[in-house]
């Protein structure tokens, strides 16, 4: 999930900012997003107060959070399966190996 900053009604639209930044009107909104270089993205975020930019999918904090959730859920699953079944089961061993890789 990507969070977007909510724009107040009095604040100018996204396109107005872009026109001021580039000095020209561009085409479709989706194409504009792809046309920005990484330097322009950083400048744009700083000058226009966008804390969550759309193209930034995986921040380190987000990746770490996802990784921790997977690891925890994986551990939980392993414990449950081991308690109710025999300890020396192949599935449990292979799961343990894959869990430690993450």
Curated annotation (Swiss-Prot):
Start and end residues of each stretch annotated as Disordered: 1-102
GO BP terms in the entry: chromosome condensation; nucleus organization; spermatid development; spermatogenesis
Keywords of this entry: Chromosome, Developmental protein, Differentiation, DNA condensation, DNA-binding, Nucleosome core, Nucleus, Phosphoprotein, Spermatogenesis
Modified residues (Phosphoserine): 8, 10, 37
Keyword Phosphoprotein: yes
One protein family per Pfam: Protamine_P2
GO cellular component: nucleosome; nucleus
Matching InterPro entries: PRM2
Composition-biased stretches (Basic and acidic residues): 39-48
Start-end of Basic residues biased regions: 49-102
Subunit relationships: Interacts with TDRP.
Function: Protamines substitute for histones in the chromatin of sperm during the haploid phase of spermatogenesis. They compact sperm DNA into a highly condensed, stable and inactive complex.
Name of the protein this chain belongs to: Protamine-2
Naturally occurring in which organism (per UniProt): Pan paniscus
Gene (name only): PRM2
